[in-house]
Amino acid sequence: MCDEDVAALVVDNGSGMCKAGFAGDDAPRAVFPSIVGRPRHQGVMVGMGQKDSYVGDEAQSKRGILTLKYPIEHGIVTNWDDMEKIWHHTFYNELRVAPEEHPVLLTEAPLNPKANREKMTQIMFETFNTPAMYVAIQAVLSLYASGRTTGIVLDSGDGVSHTVPIYEGYALPHAILRLDLAGRDLTDYLMKILTERGYSFTTTAEREIVRDIKEKLCYVALDFEHEMTTAASSSSLEKSYELPDGQVITIGNERFRCPEAMFQPSFLGMEACGIHETTFNSIMKCDVDIRKDLYANTVLSGGSTMFPGIADRMQKEIGALAPSTMKIKIIAPPERKYSVWIGGSILASLSTFQQMWISKQEYDESGPSIVHRKCF
């Protein structure tokens, strides 16, 4: 096969979900939890030929007998052995491809430590023998997916949120801000406030149920205090949810109290600024001449920006912080849950990008540090 016919693989490794597929496609083929599970008790199931580890959906479905671990914490890989298992699962079980036959585009968190990028590069070339690879910053890919090269991206996933100002395709590292508050924290917070209502959710398996409640029923209030008053005086905001055992629970103000923590981290006992203030602070760290372009191109990305009402609230809050004459535009594409992956798919299929890949030959000559020279 000649190089032109080989589709590149695009793998977006998130703290919560791994998204993988082929460059040129408009959506990822595989989306599965970034988890590795190991049996809690040895040999419970006699004759099952029990594996020593399970990845993704299989780990999720067998969660009752496993201990689940997330190898990516706050967007950054912390457990490389488990990460390798996730990549192996991605190539061989999900996409069913031979990684030695395809260039691979990986994504990384903004401000990812140098040693981490090198380790990713090394594993791709030495363990999986890929012919070529590239590492791209997640938020930059989201911006590309929205058809822009300048703007500020608020990327909020399961493990971490970042505000990343980008000018003419380049992230501005001095102005990137990280907020360790994301989907997993919101799920934990919802578990806590549902417990106050008398429903008990404690185990990792029950956390998944609460995550589903969060995704299906939560929303962001435009005016939090006003919404609290409405919730107290009527049942119009109440919704019911059926648990796997058939029990039905009712949730009211929890629906918007949970995501409100993104705007008021003090709800979680955190001293950090909310996502609106973090976005504003990021813009203020940029050169005064480009701020106008950032305000007018504020792009939301990641699963934790999927709450209904979030764009209107961001518009209102940033409007209150910015100069009164400033034009502010919040862009919330419907496919933003996967916009990092989509941006990667676009980038890896551009003809102009083909000379950007790090080839196996370049890696063999320079070693893992080549990644800092070719990917920025």
Swiss-Prot record:
Pfam families tied to this protein: Actin
Keyword set, alphabetical order: Acetylation, ATP-binding, Cytoplasm, Cytoskeleton, Hydrolase, Nucleotide-binding, Oxidation
EC number(s) reported in the record: 3.6.4.-
Any one Gene Ontology cellular component term annotated for this protein: cytoskeleton
Highest taxon of source: Eukaryota
Top-level enzyme category: hydrolase
Catalysed reactions, as listed in the record: ATP + H2O = ADP + phosphate + H(+)
In-chain residues carrying the UniProt-annotated modification N-acetylaspartate: D3
Positions where Methionine sulfoxide occurs in the chain: M45, M48
Location in or out of the cell: Cytoplasm, Cytoskeleton
Signal peptide: none
Nucleotide-binding listed as a keyword: yes
Cleaved propeptide residues: 1-2
One GO MF term attached to the UniProt entry: ATP binding
Post-translational modifications reported in the UniProt record: Oxidation of Met-45 and Met-48 to form methionine sulfoxide promotes actin filament depolymerization. Methionine sulfoxide is produced stereospecifically, but it is not known whether the (S)-S-oxide or the (R)-S-oxide is produced.
Matches recorded under SUPFAM superfamilies: Actin-like ATPase domain
Physiological role: Actins are highly conserved proteins that are involved in various types of cell motility and are ubiquitously expressed in all eukaryotic cells.
Protein family membership: Belongs to the actin family.
Protein name per its UniProtKB record: Actin, acrosomal process isoform
Gene source species: Limulus polyphemus
